[in-house]
């Protein structure tokens, strides 16, 4: 498995603003909680970027990332009501 990395300053901001961290994401990736992985819909602006849809505490989060030969770099964590409804059947 490739190394997973992220920006520590972004992680601190996500913990404060969204009460979720990249450590949470990595835990759920390892637990097999990825519902789907898609190409970013705007490949012109975000070339090569993909998005994991991950369940964390019964809520779906979008996690954009860039994958290289050496690592997977996590960009941010976005809570998604729309994806939660689609994949889980209801909002929390």
Where are these regions (language model features)?
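Ribonuclease/tRNase effector modules and their secretory precursors
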Residues: 1-92
């Amino acid at each position: 498995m490739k190394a997973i990395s992220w920006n520590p300053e972004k992680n601190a901001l996500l913990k404060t603003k969204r009460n979720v961290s990249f450590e949470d994401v990595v835990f759920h990736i390892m637990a097999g909680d990825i519902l789907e992985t898609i190409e970013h819909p705007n490949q012109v602006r975000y070339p090569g970027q993909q998005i994991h849809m991950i369940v964390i505490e019964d809520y779906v989060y979008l996690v954009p990332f860039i994958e290289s030969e050496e690592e997977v770099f996590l960009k941010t964590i976005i809570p998604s009501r729309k994806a939660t409804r689609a994949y889980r059947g209801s909002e929390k």
